[in-house]
Swiss-Prot record:
GO function term, MF aspect, one: ATP binding
Domain of life: Eukaryota
Keywords from the UniProt entry: ATP-binding, Calcium, Cell membrane, Kinase, Lipoprotein, Membrane, Metal-binding, Myristate, Nucleotide-binding, Phosphoprotein, Repeat, Serine/threonine-protein kinase, Transferase
Lineage: Eukaryota, Viridiplantae, Streptophyta, Embryophyta, Tracheophyta
Major localization listed first in the record, in broad terms: membrane
Protein name: Calcium-dependent protein kinase 8
This enzyme's EC code(s): 2.7.11.1
Pfam families per the UniProt record, alphabetical: EF-hand_7 (PF13499), Pkinase (PF00069)
Sequence positions that bind Ca(2+) 4: 480, 482, 484, 486, 491
Residue ranges of domain EF-hand in the record: 358-394, 395-430, 431-466, 467-502
Activity regulation, per record: Activated by calcium. Autophosphorylation may play an important role in the regulation of the kinase activity.
Length: 533
C-alpha cells in the first residue's frame, strides 16, 4: 500500500511533531459496521494491537506518502527503537476492495515468518479515523538508487540482487503468498551501509493462494504484469515473470515490454518478444540471457519456479558472474528510469491528494436517483439514463458495457452501491485532465505556466540527492522536447501519459482500467497464446 519506509534526505519539507488525524466525514454502505448500532463505522483490522497508538509510540516526521496514507518515523516509547508507521486514512478507503487490501496486507505480514530480506511487522493499530501499521524502518534507499550510486555496476552485482529477490519469492510461495506487485520500488535497503540487506517492503496487493488455485483480478504495475494476468487466469508464476522483468532492467536499464500507451504495453507483453540486440546485451553472458528467457516464458506452465531460478547456473555461480562493467549507458538508463518514476510518482501523489472526499461527494445521491425501482442495484439502461441526466459526457455504449462488466464484481449484470462508487470515481477522473493541471500547478510554483529547472529541483529535493544536478538536468533534457530550457504543460502531460496512464493515482481506477483493457483485448483475440485457435 505504498512506500512504507524512509528514503535518504526525505526530511526536507516534511511535517514535524505528532500528526493530527482529522475525523472522517464520509462513510458509505460499502463499508462494514462495527456492530454497535451507532451507524456506519468502518472496521478494517481483524485483531489490532490496540486502538490508541500514542500509548506505545511517538510519531515523528513524515518519511513517505502513498495513495492511502502517510508514513511517519515513529519511536517506541519504552525502548526508544525507531520504526516506520504507515497511517492509512479511512476516508481514502472508498470501496470494499480498498478495505480488504489493507486488512489482507496486515494479515499477510503477520503470517510471513521473519526473514532478513522481508520488512517485519511490529504492531497494527486502528482508531476511528485511521489504521496505523508499525514496521521495520528501512533508511538505505531504493534498489536502483544504490546501483546508480556505485561507481562500477556489473553482471555479478545484478546476480546478487536477483538471488535476494528470488529468495523472497521462494519464501512467499512456500507460505502460500503470491506477491503480485514485484517491482524495483518495492525493495529498499535497511540502512546506508554497503553490506545492508535488501528488503521487500510492500504487500498491499499480495494474496493468499492454494496450489492449483486460479485468480482473475487484474492488479500490479503494467511493465511488470505477466501475460496470464491480462488473460485473467493466473497463479504464483506471475511473480517469476515480474522478477524476470526486474532482471532484464538490471542488465540493460530499460523494461523489456514498453509502449506509449497502456494497450501498447499490454500487447507487447502478450507478444513477449525479448530484445537482446541493443547495448549492452552483446556483452552480457549467455547464461544470464538464458535465465531471462526462462523467467519471461509466456506460458506459465513452462516458466521456471522460484526454486528452479535459484538453481540456475547464473545464480548458483553468482560470485563467478562477469565482473566487467556493463557500461555507463546502463547506469544512465537506470538513473533516468528511477528518477522519472519518482517525478511521475510525485505528480501522482498530488493527483491522489485531490481524489479524496470531494471525489465521492454526491455519489450516493446519484445512485439513489438512478435506482428508480429502489432495488439497491442499477442496470446498464439505468446507468446510461442516469449519466445523461447528470450531464456526464457521452460514453459509447460499448465502452459503458465494458466498464460495467469490469465493475460488476459479483457478475449479476447490475451494479450495487459499492460497485457504483468504483465506476463513479473512474468516470470523474476520465472526464477531463483537471487533476493533471493541478499536478502541473504544484510544480509551477511561480505560476508562469512553465516548470523551470529550479522548480523541478525544489519539487524533487527529497527524492534525489540535492547535489545531483545531472539527475535534474537529465529529467529536464528528457521532458523538455522543444529544448527551451523549461517544461510546458503539454510537455508535462506527454511525459505523464507515456507508457502508462497518469490516472492510476487511484488503485481502484487501475483495476477497472486494466479489467476493461483485458476485455477489449479478449474480444480482439489479442490474448491468445501463440498456436491457440
Amino acid at each position: 500500500m505504498g512506500n512504507c519506509c524512509a528514503s535518504p534526505g526525505s526530511e526536507t519539507g516534511s511535517k514535524k511533531g505528532k500528526p493530527k488525524i482529522k475525523s472522517n466525514p464520509f462513510y458509505s454502505e460499502a463499508y462494514t459496521t462495527n456492530g454497535s448500532g451507532t451507524g456506519f463505522k468502518l472496521s478494517v483490522l481483524k485483531d489490532p494491537t490496540g486502538h490508541d497508538i500514542s500509548l506505545m509510540y511517538d510519531l515523528g516526521r513524515e518519511v513517505g506518502r502513498g495513495e492511502f496514507g502517510i508514513t511517519y518515523l515513529c519511536t517506541d516509547i519504552k525502548t526508544g527503537e525507531k520504526y516506520a508507521c504507515k497511517s492509512i486514512s479511512k476516508k481514502k478507503l472508498r470501496t470494499a476492495v480498498d478495505i480488504e487490501d489493507v486488512r489482507r496486507e496486515v494479515e499477510i505480514m503477520k503470517h510471513m515468518p521473519r526473514h532478513p530480506n522481508i520488512v517485519s511487522l511490529k504492531d497494527a493499530f486502528e482508531d476511528d479515523d485511521a489504521v496505523h501499521i508499525v514496521m521495520e524502518l528501512c533508511e538505505g534507499g531504493e534498489l536502483f538508487d544504490r546501483i546508480v550510486a556505485r561507481g562500477h555496476y556489473t553482471e555479478r552485482a545484478a546476480a546478487a540482487v536477483m538471488k535476494t529477490i528470488l529468495e523472497v519469492v521462494q519464501i512467499c510461495h512456500k507460505h502460500g503468498v503470491m506477491h503480485r506487485d514485484l517491482k524495483p520500488e518495492n525493495f529498499l535497503f535497511a540502512n546506508k551501509k554497503e553490506t545492508s540487506a535488501l528488503k521487500a517492503i510492500d504487500f498491499g496487493l499480495s494474496v493468499f493462494f492454494k496450489p492449483g488455485e486460479g485468480f482473475n483480478e487484474i492488479v500490479g504495475s503494467p511493465y511488470y504484469m505477466a501475460p496470464e494476468v491480462l488473460r485473467r487466469n493466473y497463479g504464483p508464476e506471475v511473480d517469476i515473470w515480474s522478477a524476470g522483468v526486474i532482471l532484464y532492467i538490471l542488465l540493460c536499464g530499460v523494461p523489456p515490454f514498453w509502449a506509449e500507451t497502456e494497450q501498447g504495453v499490454a500487447q507487447a507483453i502478450i507478444r513477449s518478444v525479448i530484445d537482446f540486440k541493443r547495448d549492452p546485451w552483446p556483452r552480457v553472458s549467455e547464461t544470464a540471457k538464458d535465465l531471462v528467457r526462462k523467467m519471461l516464458e509466456p506460458d506459465p506452465k513452462k516458466r521456471l519456479s522460484a526454486a528452479q531460478v535459484l538453481e540456475h547456473s547464473w545464480i548458483q555461480n553468482a560470485k563467478k558472474a562477469p565482473n566487467v562493467s556493463l557500461g555507463e549507458t546502463v547506469k544512465a538508463r537506470l538513473k533516468q528510469f528511477s528518477v522519472m518514476n519518482k517525478l511521475k510518482k510525485r505528480a501522482l501523489r498530488v493527483i491522489a491528494e485531490h481524489l479524496s472526499v470531494e471525489e465521492v461527494a454526491g455519489i450516493k445521491e446519484a445512485f439513489e436517483m438512478m435506482d428508480s425501482k429502489k432495488t439497491g442495484k442499477i442496470n446498464l439502461e439505468e446507468l446510461k439514463f442516469g449519466l445523461h441526466k447528470l450531464g456526464q459526457q457521452q460514453i459509447p455504449d460499448t465502452d459503458l458495457q465494458i466498464l460495467m462488466e469490469a465493475a460488476d464484481v459479483d457478475g449479476d449484470g447490475t451494479l450495487n452501491y459499492g460497485e457504483f462508487v468504483a465506476v463513479s470515481v473512474h468516470l470523474k477522473k476520465m472526464a477531463n485532465d483537471e487533476h493533471l493541471h493541478k499536478a502541473f500547478s504544484f510544480f509551477d510554483q511561480n505560476q508562469s505556466d512553465y516548470i523551470e529547472i529550479e522548480e523541478l529541483r525544489e519539487a524533487l529535493n527529497d527524492e534525489v540527492d540535492t547535489n545531483s544536478e545531472e539527475v535534474v538536468a537529465a529529467i529536464m533534457q528528457d521532458v523538455d522536447t522543444d529544448k527551451d530550457g523549461r517544461i510546458s504543460y503539454e510537455e508535462f502531460a506527454a511525459m505523464m501519459k507515456a507508457g502508462t496512464d497518469w490516472r492510476k493515482a487511484s488503485r481502484q481506477y487501475s483495476r477497472e482500467r486494466f479489467n476493461s483493457l483485458s476485455l477489449k483485448l479478449m474480444r480482439e483475440g489479442s490474448l491468445q497464446l501463440e498456436g491457440e485457435n
